[in-house]
């Protein structure tokens, strides 16, 4: 199962409605009952439109395809919008969930996605093309995806910062 998961991690599953879909992890789970063990599968996926929208979903089922399908449907329902700046983020941000923490910084055009594991899949589906990211602490895929989405939710545009400070955008950059 670990070999199958390693091959499947971060692979595009196949969009039908213009959304980008990535499967991040598949785990075999066991429920112990009086008569023995019941085996099942849990899937973690992310879905994005390539233009700033992203959603995360989890699904469980007795079979892998059904678990992946449930996860994709949940990810579509949980989509949120992130503002991007020329294929990157506006400023350095940090996010945390559980013991997983991530740091992201904007990168100039042509840098590419410098990130590993589940973070790379999130950036690819959201439409980020240039970013530098580093994860610290836990490498649990579920917590890393949540920490990544938490960090992206803290990204503010210059107009949002100016409005909050009661200044104009020009006054921010003086």
From Swiss-Prot:
Gene Ontology biological-process annotations = translation
Q: Which GO terms describe its molecular function?
A: rRNA binding; structural constituent of ribosome
For whether the record's keyword set contains rRNA-binding, the answer is yes
Q: Which InterPro entries match?
A: Ribosomal_Su5_D2-typ_SF, Ribosomal_uS5, Ribosomal_uS5_bac-type, Ribosomal_uS5_C, Ribosomal_uS5_N, Ribosomal_uS5_N_CS, Ribsml_uS5_D2-typ_fold_subgr
Q: Which keywords are on file for this protein? A: Ribonucleoprotein, Ribosomal protein, RNA-binding, rRNA-binding
Disulfide-bonded cysteine pairs: these are none
Note the superkingdom of the native organism: Bacteria
Claim: rRNA-binding is one of the keywords in the record? yes
Task of the protein: With S4 and S12 plays an important role in translational accuracy. Located at the back of the 30S subunit body where it stabilizes the conformation of the head with respect to the body.
Q: Which PANTHER family match?
A: MITOCHONDRIAL RIBOSOMAL PROTEIN S5
Question: What family does the entry list?
Answer: Belongs to the universal ribosomal protein uS5 family.
The record comments on the domains as follows: The N-terminal domain interacts with the head of the 30S subunit; the C-terminal domain interacts with the body and contacts protein S4. The interaction surface between S4 and S5 is involved in control of translational fidelity.
Task: Share what the entry says about its subunit structure, partners included.
Answer: Part of the 30S ribosomal subunit. Contacts proteins S4 and S8.
Name the record gives this protein:
Small ribosomal subunit protein uS5
Q: Which organism is it from?
A: Albidiferax ferrireducens (strain ATCC BAA-621 / DSM 15236 / T118)
This protein's gene is called rpsE
């Amino acid at each position: 199962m670990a070999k199958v998961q390693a091959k499947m991690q971060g692979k595009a599953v196949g969009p039908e409605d213009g959304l980008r879909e990535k499967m991040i992890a598949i785990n075999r789970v066991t429920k112990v009952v009086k008569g023995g063990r019941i085996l099942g599968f849990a899937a973690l996926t992310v879905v994005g439109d390539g233009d700033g929208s992203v959603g995360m979903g989890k699904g469980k089922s007795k079979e892998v395809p059904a678990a992946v399908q449930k996860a994709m449907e949940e990810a579509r329902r949980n989509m949120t919008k992130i503002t991007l700046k020329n294929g990157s983020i506006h400023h350095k941000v940090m996010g945390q969930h559980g013991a997983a923490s991530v740091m992201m910084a904007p990168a100039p055009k042509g840098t590419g996605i410098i990130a590993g594991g589940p973070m790379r899949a999130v950036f690819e589906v959201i439409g980020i093309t240039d970013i530098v990211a580093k994860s610290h602490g836990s490498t649990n895929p579920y917590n890393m995806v949540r920490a990544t989405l938490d960090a992206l939710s803290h990204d503010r545009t210059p107009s949002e910062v100016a409005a909050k400070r009661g200044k104009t955008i020009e006054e921010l950059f003086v």
